[in-house]
Amino acid sequence: MKSNNNPKTMVVERYTITDRIAHTVHAIAMIVLIITGLKIYAGWEFMSFHTARTLHMIAVPFLLAVNWILIPYNIFSEGHGLMGKISHFVDHYIFGPKDLARLVGIIKNFFGKGEYPAFTVYDEKTGHYKTKLHPLMKILIPLEGLALFLITVSGIVLYKLDWSLFGLPVAQWIISISGMIAPTFGMTPVGFLRVLHLLMTYWFIFELVVHVGILEFDPRVWKYYKAIFWSGKEDLSDRHFVEVARNNPNHLPDRELWRDPSDKPSEVKE
């Protein structure tokens, strides 16, 4: 992470170029898949079935490559050594006690009690973020991973009933496993997979609404859109949602970071 030398600002790299590529491709591919998938299912008239299916199949490898190759690379390229990488993964992507405390604070703030806690924590000493994600996103991410796996597995069968990989009858294996579950719901194996595929589509729509329409509907969060899609930078002097951990006895707690920047600095007591 790099910061500039202007004492009035503290600009650091929040997202690398590969982070931005991954997020942009993921967003575009997901939107294309949702729209074309619902067109195929519902029969909307704004494009032909052939066009929708073609666009759908083009977007699939992009989504899978980003989520199963590029994003894991981005995650585990951080940290030094095996334990450092594991520590980075846990701190940044696993919902823990500190995230629970932040989430409770966010819920209280929603009901007008208390301030909105900082969910971005930057360590000035190490020059790295301790955590960047909204606590609710740390809950949604593993659920998204599961949903992506299920929609891929069901999609293989919907694409081709006898699809195979290197001679292995993958689609038939999936149908066989589905056949163990489907009778419980009074469905055929393929019918169950079709419903599962549709339900996962609705999940991704729900996640999109939560991610964009609720968590980040606050204009003060829009700075992160510019960072994730374009600049990759964050100015930590903008204290909304941000805490800077300083290696000195005057480290400001979250409540102090929410002061009006025009106010005079108050004395921080240990």
UniProtKB/Swiss-Prot annotation:
Transmembrane segments: 27-47, 57-77, 139-159, 173-193, 195-215
GO CC terms of this entry: plasma membrane
GO biological process: methanogenesis; respiratory electron transport chain
UniProt KW keywords: Cell membrane, Electron transport, Heme, Iron, Membrane, Metal-binding, Methanogenesis, Oxidoreductase, Transmembrane, Transmembrane helix, Transport
Membrane topology, record value: Multi-pass membrane protein
Induction: Expressed in methanol-grown cells.
EC class: oxidoreductase
Protein name per UniProt: F420 non-reducing hydrogenase II cytochrome subunit
Species of origin: Methanosarcina mazei (strain ATCC BAA-159 / DSM 3647 / Goe1 / Go1 / JCM 11833 / OCM 88) (Methanosarcina frisia)
Taxonomic classification: Archaea, Methanobacteriati, Methanobacteriota, Stenosarchaea group, Methanomicrobia
Gene from which this protein is expressed: vhtC
